[in-house]
A protein has these predicted regions:
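Terminal amphipathic alpha-helical/low-complexity segments used for targeting or macromolecular assembly
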Residues: 1-43, 156-169
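Structural signal for interior beta-strand "rungs" in well-ordered beta-sheet cores
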Residues: 43-150
Length: 169
């Protein structure tokens, strides 16, 4: 961004996150109907569906924001970067906590699906198009369907560097 005004006017990922933060505040205050209304409008306007009950940290970056789904019991840590078409969804197998817990500094590639009550460790990378169904250790890179560990994260903070290159041994 060249100015502080650009994200406010032009970046729908930023705009959707701000709408989510208002909806989440309403959700915590017991104003669930208003929170759902904001969620619905955000989904219609931006193509991003973030449940107001989800917990999202600070410093989140949604790049090329479209087709993002974040479920009710999902937890997203600080400084996470996600590209378009990311889903943090449930599998239908769990009753209480149905959605994933994403650690700090994680990079979620385009089209990544992280499903169920699992954790993605801090400073990890999920490759584009991967389907993650099991816990991901810290500072690792996972790829594939279903996702498997393919190496180290490659840097100390993949969400900031946006390094998506997987180095094969």
């Amino acid at each position: 961004c060249n100015t502080y005004l650009q994200p406010l006017l032009f970046f729908k990922g930023f705009q959707a996150l701000q709408a989510y933060r208002v909806a989440h505040w309403l959700w915590k205050k017991g104003r669930k109907d208003m929170a759902y209304f904001l969620q619905m409008r955000c989904s219609e306007v931006f193509g991003i569906d973030i449940h107001p009950g989800a917990r999202i940290g600070k410093g989140i970056m949604i790049d090329h924001a479209h087709s993002i789904v974040i479920g009710e019991t999902a937890v997203v840590g600080d400084n996470v970067s996600m590209l378009h078409s990311v889903t943090l969804g449930g599998t239908g197998k769990d009753d209480e906590i149905r959605h994933p817990n994403i650690g700090d500094g994680v990079l979620l590639g385009a089209g990544a699906k992280v499903l169920g009550n699992i954790s993605v460790g801090s400073c990890s990378r999920v490759a584009a198009g991967s389907v993650v169904l099991q816990n991901v250790p810290e500072k690792t890179t996972v790829a594939g369907v279903p996702a498997k560990v393919v190496g180290a994260a490659g840097c100390t903070n993949p969400s900031i560097s946006m390094d998506q290159i997987i180095k094969r041994k």
